Amino acid sequence: MFKAARNLILLLLIFIFNNSYSQLGESQKPSWTQTLDYKFVPSITDQIKDGTFIPADPDAYKKLGREKRWHGNKVVPGKGLPNGDDPLLYLQENTITKSSRDPILIFETTANTATPSDPTGEIGRDYYFASWNSSFRFFNLDGTPASPASSLNTLFGNDQSGDPIALYDSQVDRYIITSMGASGLNFAISQGNNPILDGWHVYSASSFGTNGQFPDYPKYSIWSDGYYCTTNTSDNNLYVLERDKIINGDSTASIQGFDAPQMITSGFASAQVLDITNDDHPSPGNATMIYMQDDAWNQVPTDHLKIWTINIDWDDSNNSSISTPYSLDTSSFTSVFDGGGFANLTQSSGPDIDAMQAIVMNQAQFRKFPTHNSAVLNFVVDALSGNDELAAVRWYELRQDTDGEPWVVFQEGTYTAPDGRHAFGASMAMDVQGNIGMGYSSMSSSENISLRYTGRYANDPIGEMTLEENLIGQSNATNPSVRYADYAHLSVDPSNDKTFWFVSEYFNPGRRDLVGTFQIAANYANDIGVVSVDSPLSGLLSNEETVTVSIFNYGEDTVSNFDVSFQLDSGNIITETYSGTVASTEIVQHTFSTTADLSVVGTNYEICAYTSLSSDEDASNDNFCSEIQHLNPNDLGVTEVSSPVSGTNLSSTELVTIEVTNFGGAEQSNFEVSYEVNGTTVTETVPGPLAGNSTLDYIFSQSLDLSAFGTYEITASVYLENDS
């Protein structure tokens, strides 16, 4: 039987212009130092009493934020790896997922925001501090408002232009808000731990210079010896503020500015300095700045992460420095969408929206553990090759042995959302146990923007987000603008060091910011459940199939001697005792002594398995069901023509690559495949073997001439005798 797949190849003529670029620099001392301008601003409560309080702009929703600053497109069309799909894509797609807990709390911070909303917020011990565009507001821990929505002008005066970042300095129990100025940056910290009743120490934009450039896209981090800020500027793109003095409202607090050497960009850039997640600080110095480097950009030979180390001497700035960077090799990635432009992801209606490319997303987070330090970060990538486009989240955990030691890549992954939806606009952090939580935006051409989350336990297989996706909020309208969010923000609750608070933008029906809180770490002492049926799997099956399941300990205590059961369709329930011990967050397998009959060809079976622990405190995650098919033995098909793809400079010797899928259960070898173009057919033999229920890519030895401009249709097929 012949089964065919078609691919339409369109040859395009595109003119490529060369750009000139400066030479790479060296490690540097500060390029700029200055004492910050200081003022004290009364509390929100006092401002309301004396009539000086400035509320949030009631007409903010009518306004459009500043355009993103583009410093020349430095993307080289056709340059860089991977040549195919993201190399980590299939690891995530084949992940065995565990159930995730439902959101704990969901609430909106604003329904009155300009475009985009610039959502940011951090959870403190007593309040959630939210900000957007040019406003901010404090919320009680139950999501109810604790203060009126306030204009940033009530702290900074008229010289502020939005792009706020809200921070909480857990070590000193203070709340921080920042914003852009006309040619500088604003910074304010609460005088005490009650940001509504306490006043504010404000450091003004007039002395926070960016060398005359607009301080686009500022991103802040807390480190032991300073508050660090990166900006999307062509030079003077890193700043450090004197944390110890700022905490005390010292008018002599200073700032040091740097040019990060050897930072190559696509024309828009946002590096991140590591932000300390909790109040366990490393020793002062050796702050780390990270930026991705895509080999699709000019002057970047391979995909990698670039690492800078910053050391500050507040007594003598001549001793301060930013290092020459070192590189961490990564799996290849494509961070470029639409040649570097901002209109990327297709909605069901309205304009394509910004995927937020070339950005290490807010924030890159640091956490100390007894045996090592960890850092987590992410950025958006295009996970599919050719003209197909799928936004996914490339994420990393870096580790160092002790403070100040070199970083290494401990794990990396590419997270894709289910159902072919985009995943982008992510923010992530680690909890006290080393579990990773990640919030993100998702959408497709048929589904509106939603806010969701996933994560992984510390002991899970590396490179995988193992928790089932969960929903925070679903938009009921599309985005009327190309601009979307610009960034998102996830923080960890300091009260338990476990609960994640995520905020981003959605539409209900207008533009709004939505907070969702969720937790991965256990709140229960005893909580176990089946997370997968490991065998049998779909294929050629018998009347005596061995049943093996995986059991996960969600709880904090070690458990043993509990019952585990399975049921085939509506048949008898088989129950056995697992006599081993399972530690917290450990996964174990159990193989039943009783087999299952799955012998009827073409039948879909369901096996459901579950645990029974008398002291289990959460029964919602006890069971898992799996559908298993007894496959026909012989069933092959071509499922994709993956190359060549439409583009420029196609040659007379283009290789033709197809994907062949074995839908059957029997291994296949020495079968024929063909491709046909304009009446000419090429047939070759695939030696195999191709295992049942699997795929392979086959590259034809006879190439294809696509050197003439035009449109070509490629039809590919496979022939297998006795194909069912």
What label would you give each PLM region?
Residues A5, I9, N211-G212, V531:
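Intrinsically disordered, low-complexity Ser/Thr/Pro-rich tracts
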Residues L8, L12, N19, S234, ...:
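Short secondary-structure junctions and interdomain/linker hinges
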